[in-house]
Every structure is written in structure tokens, then in C-alpha cells.
Regions:
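Active-site loop/helix belt of alpha/beta enzymes
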Residues: 144-290
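Conserved, mostly hydrophobic/aromatic
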Residues: 31, 55, 77, 109, ...
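A charged N-terminal "starter" segment
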Residues: 1-136, 175-183, 214-217, 222, ...
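Short, glycine-/Ser/Thr-/acidic-enriched flexible segments
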Residues: 30, 57, 80, 101, ...
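Charged (often Lys/Glu-rich) extended helix/loop segments that serve as interaction or gating elements
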Residues: 257-261, 265-370
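Glycine-rich, aromatic-flanked loop segments that form ligand/cofactor-binding clefts
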Residues: 133-147
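Conserved active-site and cofactor/substrate-binding residues in soluble primary-metabolism enzymes
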Residues: 7-10, 26-33, 57, 122, ...
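General beta-strand structural signal in soluble alpha/beta enzymes
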Residues: 52, 73-76, 96, 117-120, ...
Length: 370
């Protein structure tokens, strides 16, 4: 797909007169259209809710936009809980999914009435000791171990991840939680990151749906929801094809009808936590070229740095770059696009073919919304 900015050079020229670079810019129209598309894709499930991953974009204005579409908040820290609370999210609209969790964070989540999603078997006793009870509604994060594979070769390694209960632990955990007073249960799993395929959610759903039937049969627990978490990705590179949320939703529905409905579990709600999919393409980092350097390589220095966008510096992530006003010019110059931090990893692009960049040019770094 061709990567085009959602803003024109003329619009940016006006914006920078008021807001100096660098800054993040968001496409409200795109955010709203995407949120509506997600709702429509899962409208077959009456209890569906997207719990937006606050860590992806901890911005109160954006949280309030998503709240208009009945989104909740997926929180993993005290700060995120405080932000969700400050914007009027409460009770069942907050999912607290944390790991290595401090006692005060469990206590605050319980105070807000959030759904607590336990990451570890030992957290059952820790939670009870911390807040003095087990909530009536509780969730557990599942990790099946091994390697998670899909037909297109995309894979991840849950067995090497620090998160979640094992298969044996989640069965035993549900039994213990029920004995301690829990009445309503949920499960959660995140098995692969940024999957650019419509196959991931339906395959994950089948695995979790089968587990839920087993949990119901072996524990007698009343399972109210299944949280498919995140992992639905976006096309950072121009040669990638975007996911189709309608196809994804239909794939999950088919698995639901095949597995849960015949088992008498057709009233279970489906939840998601698609932070990247909800916001990634609808934000960009706008920065200005302020220096050029000609040594062993050609460098363009911009006024943004890794503090504004960490993904490239942390793990070499690709973010497409558009030189505004030069979209139709040939990409015949090879540059490293760098920030000013005293770390050599502070680079937004390495050996990137771009049009000739002049000082003062505005650069749009794509897909920074999450």
C-alpha cells in the first residue's frame, strides 16, 4: 500500500506557525471511523467491548473520543488507572492487566471497581492478602507455552514470555478463586505481537474458546468473557497489506459459532485490547530538518529525538518517512535520519532512500499513534 500522510503540506505550514516542531499530530476523523469499524465487525456479539490499551497512547483527549464508542481502558500501571479514573472510566470499563504488580496498584484497581486480570497463580493469594477479599468478577491471563504459528509464517514464542498462567495453573486457579468467593470469570491471552494477518485473532479465539469449554467442564465456573487482548497489527511498511477488521471479526464469529454455541456458552462476551490497531496509523510525528552532515555517511539531523519516538531506537523498528512537499520527487538520496541524543541508536531511519532533504523541510514520521 502507498503510505500517504493524513495531512497536507499546506495544512502543516499553518500548524507549525502556532505549534513549533516536533509534535505528534492525530487524525480524529480516522480514529472515529476506525473505532466505528471495530464496533461493526464485532456487532454480532452483544457484549463486545474494546478496552483501549492506555499505554499505547496515554492521551486524555483520545481516551474521551474512544469513550464515545463505548471503549473501555486497558490499564497496566497505577498511572494508567489514575488517567482512566480522571476521564470518567470506572468499574467494568477498566481492565487492569499487570504483572509483577505492587500491592498498592491492586488496591487502587479494586477501589475503582476495575476488572482485575491476574497474571500469575501466586497473585491469587497476594491479591487476597492485599485487599482482604477476592472480587466477584476476576480474570486470569493464559499462556499456553510453546510456539504460536500461523500459516503465513508469522510466529511468536509464548513459552519464552514472562506472562500468564500455564494450562494446569489456570484450571487450578479457577477452582481456588471460586472457593474464595469469585462468581464471574474471564480469561485473557496475548500470544503474538503486531500480526499483519487476518488469521491471528480467529486462531487465538479458537484456542481460547476450547480452553473455556474445558474450564467450564472441569471447574464449574461461570465464565462471562474472553479477552483476545492485542496483537492485531498495522502495516508500518509500504509493502504490507493492512488487516481487514471485518474479516477478522467474521473469523472470530465463525469460531464462536462452532465451539462456544454448541457447548451452551453462546452468551459469553468478547473483549479486545487493540491499542496499536486503534491508534497507530492515526498519529504521526512532525519534525523539521535542522542539520546535515557529510562524513562516512549522509546524515540529516531533525529536531525530534528518541524521547519523542522510542521504537526505532529500542528495537530498530521501521517507520515510514515522508518529506512534505516532495512526495513526487525521486527517492535518490540515502540518509540516516537522526536526533540529538548522545546515543548512536537515536536514529529514525538508517540508509533510507528519500528525496533530497533541505534544511527547514518538514518530515512526517508515520504510524506513531501508538
Amino acid at each position: 500500500m502507498e503510505k500517504k500522510p493524513f495531512v497536507t503540506k499546506e495544512q502543516l505550514d499553518e500548524i507549525v506557525k502556532k505549534y513549533p516542531t516536533p509534535f505528534h499530530l492525530y487524525d480524529e476523523k480516522g480514529i472515529r471511523e476506525n473505532a466505528e469499524a471495530v464496533k461493526e465487525a464485532f456487532a454480532w456479539n452483544p457484549g463486545f467491548r474494546e478496552y483501549f490499551a492506555v499505554k499505547a497512547t496515554p492521551n486524555p483527549f483520545i481516551l474521551n473520543i474512544l469513550k464515545e464508542y463505548d471503549c473501555g481502558c486497558d490499564c497496566s500501571s497505577l498511572t494508567e488507572l489514575m488517567l482512566a479514573d480522571s476521564q470518567g472510566f470506572d468499574g467494568q470499563h477498566i481492565m487492569f492487566s499487570s504483572n509483577d504488580t505492587p500491592a498498592e496498584e491492586f488496591a487502587f484497581a479494586d477501589e475503582l471497581g476495575a476488572i482485575i486480570n491476574l497474571d500469575d497463580f501466586t497473585h491469587i493469594d497476594f491479591l487476597e492478602q492485599t485487599i482482604g477479599h477476592i472480587p466477584e468478577t476476576i480474570s486470569c491471563r493464559y499462556n499456553p507455552g510453546g510456539v504460536f504459528k500461523m500459516s503465513n509464517g508469522i510466529m511468536d514464542n509464548p513459552g519464552d514470555a514472562k506472562y500468564g498462567f500455564t494450562h494446569e495453573q489456570i484450571i487450578e486457579g479457577f477452582k481456588i478463586l471460586k472457593e474464595k468467593g469469585a462468581k464471574y470469570f474471564g480469561i485473557h491471552a496475548f500470544l503474538a505481537s503486531n500480526t499483519v494477518t487476518n488469521e491471528y485473532y480467529p486462531k487465538l479465539a479458537r484456542q481460547l474458546f476450547e480452553l473455556v469449554v474445558e474450564l467450564r467442564d472441569k471447574t464449574g465456573c461461570d465464565i462471562k468473557f474472553i479477552n483476545l487482548s492485542g496483537g492485531v497489527g498495522i502495516p508500518y511498511r509500504p509493502d504490507q497489506t493492512p488487516n481487514d477488521i471485518r474479516v477478522i471479526g467474521e473469523g472470530v464469529r465463525e469460531a464462536f459459532e462452532e465451539i462456544l454455541v454448541p457447548a451452551g456458552l453462546g452468551d459469553i462476551s468478547i473483549y479486545s485490547e487493540m491499542g496499536r490497531f486503534m491508534l497507530g496509523p492515526y498519529g504521526c510525528l512532525v519534525t523539521k530538518a535542522i542539520h546535515e552532515k557529510h562524513t562516512y555517511k549522509e546524515y540529516i539531523g531533525v529536531d525530534a529525538c528518541a524521547a519523542n519516538l522510542m521504537r526505532p531506537a529500542i528495537y530498530g523498528a521501521y517507520h515510514h518517512i515522508t518529506v512534505m512537499g516532495k512526495e513526487n520527487e525521486p527517492c535518490d538520496h540515502k540518509y540516516d535520519v537522526t536526533g540529538s541524543l548522545c546515543e548512536n541508536c537515536d536514529k529514525f531511519a538508517i540508509d533510507r532512500m528519500l528525496p533530497k532533504i533541505d534544511m527547514g523541510d518538514l518530515l512526517v514520521i508515520h504510524d506513531t499513534g501508538a
